[in-house]
Amino acid sequence: EYSNAQLLDLFSIFSANPDKLTMVVIALATSIASTGLPLITEAVTLKDRVGLAKLTSGNLQLFSFFMFPATFGVMLLAYPLNTLFYTPDSLGSNVLIQASFVGLFLGLYMLVSNMLQGMFENKAAINYLVIGFLVKLLLQYPAIRLFEVYGPLLATMIGFAVSCTLILKRIHEVAQIGRASCR
């Protein structure tokens, strides 16, 4: 069991500290999603399936091009970044690494949910968010018990992974993406 002081330390390491640094990386995904949204909506309105498939594929490739290096850069520099902004602490650095990895899923969710809403599938986007949130709620307590400070991040990652999987499946159906249409 933990003392109140230890719990407060763990909570500060988990809650606020890594989020400030990972949100910079997540902002990249949000900007990618925002710039592609009008083009996706236009392609849906014009019933341009080939253009929609190319835009969808291009957005996912652009996301990968920026997010993977940015995320892995933060992961590699976790200890120096954590030391620069907070204090030298290996647990805080490890939580930052995990939070950066979770940020990939959050960024992907931002991208694909925007794309799905641009395809006028707002109800599906909300339903998939709710499903992911319910998965997170179900996993939160067991994950905290098993993985302690990493538990909430793991539950969040799995919840967003479920939402992203459902959204990507729906995008595939709506955009009728095939291998030939993305060339």
Segments predicted by a language model, with ranges:
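Hydrophobic/aromatic residues within the transmembrane alpha-helices of Major Facilitator Superfamily
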Residues: V24, L28, I32, P69-F72, ...
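Transmembrane alpha-helical segments of multi-pass transport proteins
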Residues: G132, R179-R183
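Interfacial segments at transmembrane-helix termini and the short loops linking adjacent helices
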Residues: Q6-L8, M75-L106
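Short alpha-helical transmembrane segments in multi-pass integral membrane proteins
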Residues: L55-M75, Y150-A175
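Short runs within selected transmembrane alpha-helices of multi-pass transporters and secretion channels
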Residues: N94-F120, A124-I144, V149-H172
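Interfacial transmembrane-helix starts/ends
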Residues: S15, D48-F65, P69-L77, G92-A99
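Alpha-helical transmembrane segments of polytopic membrane transporters and translocases
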Residues: Q6-A29, L60-L62
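Helix-loop junctions and terminal segments of transmembrane helices
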Residues: A27-K47, T56-L60
